[in-house]
Amino acid sequence: MISVQSLCKQSINQTMKHISKIVLIAIVFLSSCFTRSDAQVESPKFQKKLQRLLRHNVKEVSIAEVKQFETVIYLDAREKVEYNVSHVENSVWVGYDDFDIQSVEKLDKSKTIIIYCSVGYRSEKVTKKLEKVGFKTVYNLYGGIFEWYNQGLPIVNNDGRETDKIHAYNEKWSQWVKGRKEGDEVF
């Protein structure tokens, strides 16, 4: 015959198993809500600046990680004047102040999309907007076009020709663009 004490132990054990499963599910869910990036830039000072500047509330991708993707759609979240100086080849300008979600509604939501701006601040906000409307594989380019340029990757002008000119936003932000010759940065 089963004792009352034995039944209580079984009931408590089953309840604890259910609670453990619920807690585990909650931990997994909550950890996915708070995206933490391991993305890095080459300059320790720039890295420190980005850690403070960005909210890190979207998926971030480093320049090294970008190279792992076979096909990518690049969206430029800078202002048109910045884009006109230079941009990542084949990128689509979507802007920031004038960003309109309708400008990207025809994009395939299952494709990998990387959004960039100068350093990642504006593109982080645009990335969040795309996530909210159902884009699944969208990433903020950590360090933006400045880090792209710093690591020697090509940028092109509006004629599609490779250029060394880069819009450095303003003199203060130009400090994060390295390896340039006098006159390569534009404000």
Identify the role of each PLM range:
Residues 1-45:
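Bacterial Sec-dependent N-terminal signal peptides
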Residues 17, 33-63, 69-70, 80-111, ...:
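Rhodanese-like catalytic fold shared by cysteine-dependent sulfurtransferases
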Residues 74-76:
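Structural scaffold elements adjacent to functional motifs in cytosolic proteins
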Residues 116:
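Short, surface-exposed ligand- or partner-binding patches at beta-edge/loop junctions that are enriched
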Residues 120:
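Conserved G/P- and acidic residue-centered "switch" motifs that form tight phosphate/ATP-binding loops
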